[in-house]
Amino acid sequence: MGLTDITALTSRIQELEKENSRLRAILDKNGISYTFKDNNLQENAVPAPVVTYSLEEKVAIFQGLFQGRSDVFAKRWYSETSKKSGYQPVCEREWNPDFCDKRKYKCADCPNRQFAPLSYSHLFNHLAGKDKWGRDVIGLYPIRKDNTCCFLCADFDDKSCEHGYKNDVLAFVNVCKAWKVPCYIERSRSGNGAHVWIFFQTPIPASKARKLGNTILTEAMNKEMRLSFKSYDRFFPNQDTLPEGGLGNLVALPLQGMVRRQGNSVFVDEHFNAFSNQWNVLANIQKMSQADIDLLLQKHIAPSLGNLSTTSDAKPWETPDAELIEASDFPKQIALTRANMLYIPLTGLSARCVNAFKRIAAFRNPEFYERQGMRLSTYNVPRIISCSELSDHYLALPRGCEDAVSDILSRHAVNTSISDKTNHGRSISVTFKGELREEQQMAMDAMIAHRTGTLSATTAFGKTVFAIAMIAQRKVNTLILVHNKALLAQWNERLEQFLGIDEAIDKPHGNRGRKKDSSTIGCLYSGKNTLHGIIDIALIQSCLNEGEAKPFVKQYGMVIVDECHHVSSVSFEQVLRQVTATYVYGLTATPIRKDGHQPIIFMQCGKIRFASKAKDQIVKQTFNRVLVPRFTTYRNITDDTKTYTQLTQALSEDSARNEFIIDDIKSALENRRTPLVLTTRTAHVRTLAQMLLPFADHVVQLVGADSNKEKRIALQKLQAIPQTESLAIVATGKYIGEGFDYPRLDTLFLTMPIAWKGNIEQYSGRLHREYDGKSEVQIYDYIDFHVPLCDSIYRKRLKL
């Protein structure tokens, strides 16, 4: 049989498969049943006759199956020195002294780069495998220039599979078999993993291929409880479209000559035994038609990633509904354990039920979809963020998921008991030396009714004083977690002012044997540790040791997390995952994070129990609010395509624009107002502060780059300034956004373009403290409308 005959037969088979698909679609549409043999993985199939193929025919069969980009491909590299390996696109000009200067350019940045097309000889060398280091192995880019692909490959290996790759592979394959999706298993190059291949008759959109894979995987997770969410990131292709200027991810092709002789990189059956005749398997592979894929996706119309935790501005604590769970998926009774997390025993739970519980603690990663939408690389950016942990006997979920789990169990009439292993702490004698406003008392009633919860309230609500009242109400030893020293100092001051503590502590001895004066309020931050286990304030970074939470965080009955929207950061979450306190509460003015990771806040601290919005505060405050838009004449003559960082630098260095801002600040000072001038750049702070010196009695600079001593002196200076003397504060937004409290401020100058709602709320909140004589607060908003990016950001601000 010649090469021409093979090509003609392949073409004829594809035509017949298309016709069969069309006819099956007509039968399905009219409700007419039909049967055909399921040849998935060659099960129950009549063995194809064994044919001997020439080398040319083998390469032709191989090339006909594994089709991707033909104008570029990658080859494996291996360093004998470092023992490292990887893949990089093949360049026709590599090592050519006229074009290739590796000392000057990395390959990815070389302007002389010229990709080599995939040829017969490259494929032959890949299959022959003559290089002992595997440097002839080919990596194929699946996404073609028109964003289509000819196959889908699911990757499973022991590093990403929680209980061995074989179980995950079979779970995926079993769904394929049930859904009549032809698929083929290939043992990986290392032998510690496998690929599952699905081939298409014609190129289909990569997005559709990925949706097919996601849908199959989601159903497989309902069959196999230990399938990880990481598997959603292990498809080839890994993106719906090509990244801008990139090639997408690559997949190493099978039948690699060197390792094939060792029994790896070969196609295997469901028992993971290699087929004796690999070429017979490849020559008889069945492909899916686009019509079959469309019918399958129409039939399984649930979200391809399954139900996940979702968030919105209105209800940021939303959790997914349990899909298609029945009473038979549960045992008649279940004993949960409440500790640092909620532990659910696996005994008696179906895989579908465990999967539903896991999805309560999982959500789509907005960063992935933002990068994909911008056609940027999504390498190492997960689609789904999961906060659950699965062990041999238990599924562990964050404490904030307890309500959702209890609701599911209740709806299915499961007799539920909870063993409380949390730390109830020790009783302390404390009293509240203040009085709550009506709204604060409403928040207290809402929060105190629950062991966990988040208070969402604007800056002027008085969250710190409210939390102190809650400490007095609970009367258990408490740890307060903050993320910067300014907040720590503010908490220390407020606790001294509003909390009476009738507890004795052992006073430490000084160097001369005298007992030092020591507060009953303990503190932990760099260089200082005065923790007493009564009322302690700790810098979150100081609670970690080499990435692990220190044991002392488990010694409290209550933990309060200030500015809890930072819980989503790795350090905060690591500490909160180890906290065993009975009571865990979060305080925040901005429960919606810019990165979209706010579900972690509610998983660790509990859902929002009380929310006070800015509009509610406006009604109760005694001053008016005025927005003053100021349109500048700034034009970027040279280039309109600058990045945000480049743009802000150019804005900060424009002398005419700076003079325009200074004139407004000067007028505010002349009208006996107290301005806060915010920028994003430290150098701009210095520039504006210097320009303001002739017009104010005091000009105070606050930037994060200053030393702790400089910050302390600046804050002390602020407190000492009499009301009769004029004052201007110039600061970076990052420094002033949280933990800064100076009620005298009544005018805000936003000198740089900002768009995110959270920043706007934080910055404007600096003005909203009540103060004698404050009748109006003003915000000056500078709009560089001649610059498209600035104009776009301004329009976003108007929608907030």
What is each of the regions a protein language model found here?
Residues 528-531, 687, 697-734:
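Conserved helicase ATPase core of P-loop NTP-dependent helicases/translocases
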Residues 591, 755-775, 779:
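Conserved SF2 helicase motif VI
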Residues 557-558, 565-626:
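Post-DEXD/H (motif II) to motif III coupling segment of the RecA-like Helicase ATP-binding lobe
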Residues 137-170, 201-317:
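DNA replication initiation modules
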Residues 487-523, 527:
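Conserved helix-turn-beta segment of the N-terminal RecA-like "Helicase ATP-binding" lobe
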Residues 639-680, 687-691:
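Conserved interdomain hinge at the start of the Helicase C-terminal
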